[in-house]
Amino acid sequence: MDQFEIGDTVIADSRLWDEDEMGPITEVKDVSVGEVFTKVGIAAVYEYDFGDGWMHHLELVDRSTHPTQEVLPLIISGENACPPEDCGGIHGYKELLEVLKNPKHPEYGETKVWVGSTFNPTKFSVNSHTKELGTLNKYMKEYEEGF
């Protein structure tokens, strides 16, 4: 599960949300990024995977227009690799990085197999992530059609 918080407003997927337990929300599919980030300086907190507590601070620092034929959203820059799914949150990821630094660590071999031989925590590829985003967009369309 994930959610966006902008001030007192919570934006989430109502199919995965229990309002009785977690309070009222704005339905994520009823709000566009442009409706939330209306001016430079608007900030939000994005929480991914409630169990692991990945908190991301998002802030609109600039607005620009893009040609209409351009596929959006568009990744223009980034830093470092994404932590592997289900690595145990920030603390689990720190432990994983420590294991990978030490080939003599008892968990090194198993961890290397899990993350893959090409995993590099300092690498970021705009092209690779743009392709992944395209795959995610396709998956999300299929997911929405299933409900």
For the regions a language model picked out, list residue spans one by one.
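Short linear regulatory motifs enriched in tryptophan with gly/pro/ser
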Residues: 1-147
